[in-house]
Amino acid sequence: MNRLTPTRSISNPTLGDVTRAMVEFAHKGKQDLEVRRLCEIICEDLAQGDYAGECLAIYYWVCQNIRYMRDIHDVEFVKEPARVLETRSGDCDDMATLLAAMLMAMGNRCDFVLASFNGAAVPSHVYVRVYSPKGPIVLDPVANRDTGKMLGELTSASTVPV
């Protein structure tokens, strides 16, 4: 990975533009051997077959190792998982894309959950729902950073299959 690892800048983005880029990058990331190897390292001490434990271990790794950083005002950047790992930073869509790629690299199915807060009609946040053998698990690396007050009261949520 280097400074030329792709990032997509979207001017005047629609929600569809952003989610399409996220889905594309998550599928590309799940096939990245560095992403897979990192997941193997993160999960190496877990019991074989502890798939829910793998999901949580990967989630906690993202929470502890990727810094939340907002995009430039009025410019939407969507980073490929390799770029997020390289910079160790990203906003909610970057962190969700990396998390989904890592979870899918370990054989899990995921959705992106698009959320609106405080009565807003347009989603302003995204997180991941992963389907483990024990059932769906909601994973939000941004909310894990005590930003629940920043996010406000959930108005609505919709899903985009990855």
Model-predicted regions and their roles:
Residues 1-162:
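A structural boundary/capping signal
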